[in-house]
C-alpha cells in the first residue's frame, strides 16, 4: 500500500468516525454494555498456566470495532469530502459497526463470542471474557480484553489452530509469547515454573502525568515528625480524585 493510499484510507475512516459521534438526534441504542476480563481472572489464569508449564501467547485484534454487525438501523450524514453531488441530502445506512458508535464495543464482543464458540470454545458463566476448550488431556484457555487476547494451553498444534482460526475471522497480529499485557510486564522463568508481574512502566507513566517523575521512593508508614508542605499536596480535589483513580483499580 502506497503512502498516498494509506493517507486516503485514514482520511475516510476519520470522517466516518467523526460523523458517527454526531449521528443521531434521538438516542436509541438498546444495550451498549460490553464485558472485559477482570484483572484478577487474568492473574489467576497466568498462575495456573505457570504452574502447569502451559504456553502463554498473545494476539492483538486490528480495527476491532469494525467487525461488529449492527442489529438495529443506524443512519448518518455523508462524511465531508465524500458527499455524492447528485444526492447531497441523502444519508448513509451503516451495514456494520464503526468507531464512535455507542454500541460498537458490545457488537464487537457479540461477534467475537459467536466466532470463538464456532471453534469449540465454551464461555465461562462467571467470567464472560474467559473461554476454555478441552479435548481429552488437551486444554486451551482464551482471555479477551477488548482487542487483547491471551492464549494459554498445553498443546502447541492446538494453539496454532486457534491462531489460524482467529486469523480467518479477523485481522490479527501475532505477538508471540506474552510479555506485556494491560500495562503489566510479564517475567517468566519456565525452568523453575516461576512468573513475575511488574507494573513499573505504569507507575512511571502515572508519576510523569503528575510531574512526580523525579520523586524519591518513600516508606509507609511515614517517618515520625515528617513535615509536609502545601506544595506537596494536590492542588485541587479534582487532582486528588484523579491520582486516587489511577491507584484504586490496580489494587
What are these model-predicted stretches?
Residues 1-251:
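Long, low-complexity, charge-biased intrinsically disordered regions
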Amino acid at each position: 500500500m502506497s503512502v498516498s493510499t494509506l493517507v486516503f484510507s485514514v482520511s475516510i475512516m476519520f470522517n466516518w468516525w467523526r460523523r458517527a459521534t454526531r449521528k443521531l438526534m434521538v438516542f436509541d441504542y438498546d444495550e451498549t454494555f460490553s464485558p472485559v476480563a477482570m484483572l484478577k481472572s487474568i492473574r489467576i489464569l497466568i498462575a495456573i498456566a505457570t504452574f502447569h508449564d502451559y504456553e502463554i501467547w498473545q494476539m492483538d485484534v486490528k480495527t476491532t470495532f469494525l467487525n461488529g454487525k449492527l442489529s438495529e438501523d443506524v443512519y448518518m450524514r455523508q462524511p465531508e469530502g465524500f458527499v455524492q453531488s447528485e444526492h447531497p441530502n441523502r444519508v448513509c445506512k451503516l451495514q456494520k459497526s464503526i468507531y464512535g458508535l455507542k454500541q460498537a464495543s458490545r457488537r464487537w464482543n457479540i461477534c467475537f463470542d459467536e466466532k470463538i464458540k464456532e471453534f469449540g470454545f465454551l464461555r465461562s458463566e462467571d467470567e464472560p471474557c474467559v473461554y476454555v476448550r478441552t479435548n481429552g488431556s488437551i486444554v486451551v484457555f482464551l482471555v479477551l480484553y477488548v482487542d487483547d487476547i491471551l492464549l494459554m494451553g498445553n498443546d502447541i498444534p492446538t494453539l496454532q489452530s486457534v491462531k489460524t482460526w482467529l486469523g480467518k475471522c479477523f485481522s490479527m497480529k501475532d505477538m508471540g509469547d506474552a510479555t506485556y499485557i494491560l500495562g503489566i510486564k510479564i517475567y517468566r522463568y519456565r525452568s523453575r515454573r516461576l512468573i513475575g508481574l511488574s507494573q513499573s512502566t505504569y507507575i512511571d507513566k502515572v508519576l510523569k502525568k503528575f510531574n512526580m517523575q523525579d520523586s524519591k521512593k518513600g516508606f509507609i508508614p511515614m517517618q515520625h515528625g515528617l513535615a509536609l508542605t502545601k506544595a506537596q499536596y494536590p492542588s485541587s480535589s479534582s487532582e486528588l480524585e484523579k491520582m486516587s483513580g489511577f491507584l484504586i483499580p490496580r489494587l
